[in-house]
Amino acid sequence: MAQGDYQDFVVVVTGASTGLGRAVAAEVASQGAKVVIINYARNAQDAEETARQCRAQGAEAILVQGDVADDDDCRRIAAAAQPYGRIDALFNNAGTTRFNRHADLDGVSGQDFLDLYAVNVIGPYQMVRACRALLEAAPRPGAVVMTASIGAVTGLGSSVPYAASKGALNTMTLSLARALAPRIRVNAVCPGFIDTPWFAKGMGEAAADRMRASAVADTPLKVASTAEDIAASAVFLGSPASRHVTGETLLVDAGTHLGFAPLAAR
């Protein structure tokens, strides 16, 4: 991508207080975005740091607290862009999981599935619905980028409900790409292991360290991807550089899908 691919864009990023969401917000700001609407669910202090990084790049940063599982909150997030008359790119990054060994079928309940689907599948749907008119108002086709997971393809990941929810998100990406063309493009990025505090928080430091070491040792590219590594691909999908790309699920996993099985899933 060329510097300035997001020149004067109005961008919405959900789940942008830390990790991949923050990296996406900072990157679009560095690419010239005019406005970055930063959604977060709980941590206002972390979200403010994301806003600070965007403002340091010259973008206007707007913070909107809200849970994407709540349709009213989704409409409130979209309303923050209303004064600008459009949304050029929507990054549906908010997500959640429940860490559980796949073989431990008694370790997750039906409610766990519903809780994950509410955020990981219904949330992105509600965000697209809330933002549709503003995405269609963009001077070029508006772009939606979903944050899915390599677990959607391999069935691996932090838990069975998580992998299943991301598989559903990939299928929904295809459905929406057909339904919303030609005025809106819809794609998904499917990360593998990302070296962020999210894993350590859910699995513990020791397990996260093993995952990191295993990624470096066993993936074909011998790397543990950072949030910035994944953000580069997500930002590509939201940019004019991918203007002829829709309905794509882009695997950004250092080659994990070629056969490497993460320790957490064994």
For each feature predicted by the language model, list its residue ranges.
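Short C-terminal tail/terminal secondary-structure segment
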Residues: 2, 102, 154, 235, ...
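Conserved glycine-rich cofactor-binding loop
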Residues: 17-18
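Conserved glycine-rich Rossmann-like NAD(P)H-binding loop of the short-chain dehydrogenase/reductase
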Residues: 33-49
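Catalytic Tyr-X3-Lys loop
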Residues: 106-125, 145, 169, 221
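Active-site helix of classical SDR
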Residues: 128, 165, 173
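Alpha-helical segment proximal to the catalytic Tyr-Lys
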Residues: 133, 177-182, 243
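Residue(s) in the substrate-gating loop at a strand-loop-helix junction
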Residues: 149
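Short, small/polar-rich loop/turn modules that mediate ligand/substrate recognition or access, typified
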Residues: 181-185, 190, 245-247
